[in-house]
From Swiss-Prot:
<comment type="similarity">
    <text>Belongs to the universal ribosomal protein uL10 family.</text>
</comment>
<dbReference type="GO" id="GO:0003735">
    <property type="term" value="F:structural constituent of ribosome"/>
</dbReference>
<keyword id="KW-0699">rRNA-binding</keyword>
<dbReference type="InterPro" id="IPR043141">
    <property type="entry name" value="Ribosomal_uL10-like_sf"/>
</dbReference>
<dbReference type="GO" id="GO:0002181">
    <property type="term" value="P:cytoplasmic translation"/>
</dbReference>
<dbReference type="InterPro" id="IPR022909">
    <property type="entry name" value="Ribosomal_uL10_arc"/>
</dbReference>
<keyword id="KW-0694">RNA-binding</keyword>
<dbReference type="InterPro" id="IPR043164">
    <property type="entry name" value="Ribosomal_uL10-like_insert_sf"/>
</dbReference>
<protein>
    <recommendedName>
        <fullName>Large ribosomal subunit protein uL10</fullName>
    </recommendedName>
</protein>
<comment type="subunit">
    <text>Part of the 50S ribosomal subunit. Forms part of the ribosomal stalk which helps the ribosome interact with GTP-bound translation factors. Forms a heptameric L10(L12)2(L12)2(L12)2 complex, where L10 forms an elongated spine to which the L12 dimers bind in a sequential fashion.</text>
</comment>
<keyword id="KW-0687">Ribonucleoprotein</keyword>
<dbReference type="InterPro" id="IPR050323">
    <property type="entry name" value="Ribosomal_protein_uL10"/>
</dbReference>
<keyword id="KW-0689">Ribosomal protein</keyword>
<feature type="region of interest" description="Disordered">
    <location>
        <begin position="309"/>
        <end position="338"/>
    </location>
</feature>
<dbReference type="GO" id="GO:0022625">
    <property type="term" value="C:cytosolic large ribosomal subunit"/>
</dbReference>
<dbReference type="GO" id="GO:0070180">
    <property type="term" value="F:large ribosomal subunit rRNA binding"/>
</dbReference>
<comment type="function">
    <text>Forms part of the ribosomal stalk, playing a central role in the interaction of the ribosome with GTP-bound translation factors.</text>
</comment>
Amino acid sequence: MITAESEHKIAPWKIEEVNKLKELLKNGQIVALVDMMEVPARQLQEIRDKIRGTMTLKMSRNTLIERAIKEVAEETGNPEFAKLADYIDKGAAIITTDMNPFKLYKTLEESKSPAPIKGGAVAPCDIEVKAGSTGMPPGPFLGELKSVGIPAAIEKGKIGIKEDKVVAKAGEVVSHKLAVVLSALGIKPVTVGLNLLAAYEDGVIYTPDVLKIDEEEFVQKIQDAYSKAFNLSVNAAIPTAQTIETLLQKAFANARAVSIESAFLTEKTTDDILGKAYSQMLAVAREVGDDALDDELKEKLSTAVVETKAEVEEAKEEEKEEKKEEAAPAAAGLGLLF
């Protein structure tokens, strides 16, 4: 905390800046630190336009940001918040927002854009120059291409690149000469934007490795977990708001099956029990001789046989119709070949 004794040793503008940062930190629901050292002015303005209305971005010196964080932690009695200062690095800036840390990380990643690589920078990936016309007229640029190992020649009045060429592998330092050539060719191998250093919410500090998730995989895991929990609840007969309907349906089906199997007559099972008994009666009748059957039972048995034959014939006719319907499109398809 800046005391009255030490204030005269600190530039007034620094005291004012720390106070502004403290006010921002105290009012922020979610507080995050980002690194913006490598972001060019043009891309920074584009990022500001993209995030406007969803978050507040405040740039300042690292030392002042650190002081503001620690003073807010002391004034609010929140030692966990002070740990956020440990993540200050490079060209740090403060972001405050009401987005949860996961959405904040995703938003910042989506706001990034491709940019030319600078001389002396490390290639983030293999940088490849594709074969084809550069669209540039013959001139000194032809020599520049060759000087960095790119096979080039004049083709149809324009400078053309003869073949694909990897000019820098991932991890290699890009020379200033190569960086100029790549920029002239419009090759932008670098992605620039605000890199999240850490985000603070309700006593927890989130780092990028935690916030970077595969959304589709994450949703699938949640769905799988829900499905397993649902099945466990149903099989263990644990009623919940989500499973009560399924449990009642299962209980009803089980009770109905027991009632039918044990021939216990109820309003819901009488028809099924009588139907089952009738079928069993006919099955027994078929096994005994005609002499043991009365006329009424013989008539019922013959009627059942006729109905069964009719059902079989109807099924055969339906099968024939299905085959005809399947054959018609095939014949039409063959007709198109001739």
